[in-house]
């Protein structure tokens, strides 16, 4: 069973629907016991870092997540991935969960290229920089869907994949059993479903 952590941020039910499409059992929950019983955890999220971190801390689930991530796979998606980092510079400086060494910084592409805007909204090719079971069902250069204005930086040792937005944008990270994708697998069509399938098999 996959527990989708509900802390009042993000479209949890489109993610649950994608997992159901794969024949996977998933529950949307803020219950610590359910999270402990789950085989895998997903931390979704959209919006601002500080607000999301405050809401997550208010649930009392941060210690539970840290404990469970020692024993089972955890996947952060979009803002959920950013929360995995040590800190963010979105509207000030804010501490994150600290699973991934690095920081979350503003997306600053070369705006001389008029086709590049912030936020990055849309499809971009995913370039795999390390072999990992998370990507066992996809090929180099498949397209995934992004919606973001900030990205993970200074995290080379954890980076699994990048996308080009005139600068290399961290697309996916891993630290131990903890994974993150800046893109939305649940919005990335068949490619995203294959990534979620791989996560369910970790």
Question: Where on the chain are the PLM-derived regions?
Answer:
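Amide-donor transfer/coupling interface in amidating biosynthetic enzymes
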Residues: 103-202
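Short gly/ser/thr-rich secondary-structure transition/capping motifs
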Residues: 21-28, 55-59, 125-129, 162-164
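N-terminal beta1-alpha1 ligand-phosphate binding loop
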Residues: 2-24, 183-187
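Structural alpha-helical scaffold elements that stabilize or flank donor/cofactor-binding regions
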Residues: 34-35, 68, 172
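Cysteine-nucleophile active-site neighborhood
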Residues: 49-120
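Short acidic low-complexity segments
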Residues: 26-37
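Short acidic/histidine-rich motifs immediately flanking catalytic phosphotransfer sites
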Residues: 36-45
């Amino acid at each position: 069973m996959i527990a989708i952590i509900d802390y009042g941020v993000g479209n949890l039910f489109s993610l649950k629907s994608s997992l159901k499409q794969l024949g996977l059992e998933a529950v949307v929950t803020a219950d610590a016991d359910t999270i402990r019983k789950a085989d895998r955890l997903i931390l979704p999220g959209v919006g601002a870092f500080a607000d999301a971190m405050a809401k997550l801390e208010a649930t009392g689930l941060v210690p539970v997540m840290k404990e469970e991530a020692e024993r089972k796979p955890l996947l952060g998606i979009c803002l959920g991935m950013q929360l995995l980092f040590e800190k963010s510079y979105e509207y000030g400086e804010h501490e994150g969960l600290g699973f991934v060494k690095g920081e979350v910084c503003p997306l600053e592409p070369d705006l001389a290229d008029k086709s590049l805007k912030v936020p990055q909204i849309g499809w971009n090719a995913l370039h795999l920089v390390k072999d990992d079971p998370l990507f066992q069902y996809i090929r180099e250069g498949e397209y995934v869907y992004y919606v973001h204005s900030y990205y993970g930086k200074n995290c080379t040792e954890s980076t699994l994949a990048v996308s080009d937005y005139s600068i290399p944008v961290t697309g996916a990270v891993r630290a131990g059993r903890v994974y993150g994708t800046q893109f939305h697998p649940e919005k990335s069509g068949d490619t995203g479903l294959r990534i979620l399938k791989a996560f369910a098999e970790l």
